[in-house]
Amino acid sequence: MTALLDVNVLIALGWPNHVHHAAAQRWFTQFSSNGWATTPITEAGYVRISSNRSVMQVSTTPAIAIAQLAAMTSLAGHTFWPDDVPLIVGSAGDRDAVSNHRRVTDCHLIALAARYGGRLVTFDAALADSASAGLVEVL
């Protein structure tokens, strides 16, 4: 099953000084050969956070972050998933999962993972409740 890497996993992989770099690297070494994916949202998030001095102790320019992302996505097993899931689709139960403003993007990424037959891999422990459906793996 292809793993859609959440922005926090991409950041941890791309930045050796990140607190979760070792955990992300271990996961990537063990499971990336099964396939891993990015989307426009996760790629833009990587560039945005990597180039934001108020978030990253050591930040870079957007151009360098894009080059880093290009190097990562050239690694074996990568697939780019177009974002072709409208936010308004789904049942009332799916919409109820968007419990607050912090869950909007999370729920959309989970919907993308479902659309492409994959799962979302994240460090966000708040998404553990979604893990029972097999759509989320919390590292």
Curated annotation (Swiss-Prot):
Q: What is its main location?
A: secreted
Q: Which cofactor does it need?
A: Mg(2+)
The record's Gene Ontology biological-process terms are: negative regulation of growth
- Name all PINc domain ranges: 4-133
Q: Which SUPFAM superfamilies match?
A: PIN domain-like
Per its UniProt record, what InterPro entries does this chain match?
Mtu_PIN, PIN-like_dom_sf, PIN_dom, VapC_family
Keywords (A to Z) from UniProt: Hydrolase, Magnesium, Metal-binding, Nuclease, Secreted, Toxin-antitoxin system
Q: What class of enzyme is it?
A: hydrolase
Q: What is its EC number?
A: 3.1.-.-
- Tell me which CDD domains the record gives: PIN_MtVapC25_VapC33-like (cd18678)
Q: Where does Mg(2+) bind?
A: D6, D106
Subcellular location, record wording: Secreted
Recorded GO terms, molecular function?
magnesium ion binding; RNA nuclease activity
| Coiled-coil features, chain-numbered ranges | none
Report one GO cellular component: extracellular region
Family note: Belongs to the PINc/VapC protein family.
Instruction: Describe the task this protein carries out.
Output: Toxic component of a type II toxin-antitoxin (TA) system. An RNase. Upon expression in M.smegmatis inhibits colony formation. Its toxic effect is neutralized by coexpression with cognate antitoxin VapB39.
HAMAP family of this UniProt entry?
A: VapC_Nob1 (MF_00265)
Q: What's the name of the protein?
A: Ribonuclease VapC39
Name the source organism.
Mycobacterium tuberculosis (strain ATCC 25618 / H37Rv)
Tell me the name of the encoding gene: vapC39
